[in-house]
């Protein structure tokens, strides 16, 4: 569960934690959650990697918008009425942001660094295939408690710099 994961992360020897989001509201919520859970972190506004300094990261975790544009009108009201549209819309096929992040992330990952995504239940194959095609290694899909594909992860090949 999330609370256990946060507690475990607090105990790990992690030097710096950064959080980026295009939404100011999401950043404020993240700051409050970090404070409540005593997790030191720096949160900044950025559209993907646009405003990320020349940093490299050991791990990048992303939960991008992944719902296809044509599915949004049919979402449950508790989702569509309360979540900002930009937090939901993954464009035409729901994979737009995965493509961008997979393409750009190697420039921001240390050699051997990990990229992890939350995905929609039907996107495991597509996202894992894109990561493999981009040169990520040991790509795997993890299931959630309902046994749906939920996370795709892989690591950057050692000594590879894209550009």
Give short role names for the model-derived ranges:
Residues 1-10, 14-16:
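Single conserved hydrophobic/aromatic residue that forms the stacking wall/gate
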Residues 18-162:
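S-adenosylmethionine
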């Amino acid at each position: 569960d999330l609370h256990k994961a946060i507690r475990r992360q607090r105990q790990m020897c992690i030097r710096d934690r950064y959080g980026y989001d295009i939404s100011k509201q999401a950043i404020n919520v993240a700051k409050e959650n970090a404070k409540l859970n005593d997790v030191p972190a720096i949160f900044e506004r950025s559209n993907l990697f646009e405003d990320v300094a020349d940093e490299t990261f050991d791990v990048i975790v992303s939960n991008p918008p992944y719902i296809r544009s044509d599915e949004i009108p049919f979402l449950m009201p508790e989702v569509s009425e309360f979540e900002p549209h930009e937090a939901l819309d993954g464009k035409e096929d729901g994979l737009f942001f995965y493509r961008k992040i997979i393409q750009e992330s190697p420039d921001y990952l240390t050699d051997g660094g990990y990229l992890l995504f939350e995905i929609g239940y039907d996107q495991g194959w597509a996202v894992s295939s894109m990561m493999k095609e981009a040169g990520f290694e040991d790509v795997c899909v993890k299931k959630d408690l309902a046994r749906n594909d939920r996370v795709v992860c892989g690591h950057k090949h050692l000594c590879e710099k894209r550009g």
